[in-house]
Amino acid sequence: MQVNDLGFVASILFVLVPSVFLIILYIQTASREGKKDS
């Protein structure tokens, strides 16, 4: 299966960008919850 380099990079970014965004949001909310508890 021949994969276009541009398509390959685009598909990786398509998965990575939302994942990183969600991870950052989760870390921010988790750190806020931690500050509330202490």
From Swiss-Prot:
Bilayer-spanning residue ranges: 7-27
Homology family: Belongs to the PsbM family.
Keywords attached to this entry: Membrane, Photosynthesis, Photosystem II, Reaction center, Thylakoid, Transmembrane, Transmembrane helix
Gene: psbM
Species assigned in the record: Nostoc sp. (strain PCC 7120 / SAG 25.82 / UTEX 2576)
A Pfam family assignment: PsbM
Keyword Transmembrane helix among UniProt keywords: yes
Subcellular location: Cellular thylakoid membrane
The name this protein goes by in its record: Photosystem II reaction center protein M
SUPFAM superfamilies: Photosystem II reaction center protein M, PsbM
GO cellular component: photosystem II; plasma membrane-derived thylakoid membrane
Membrane topology designation: Single-pass membrane protein
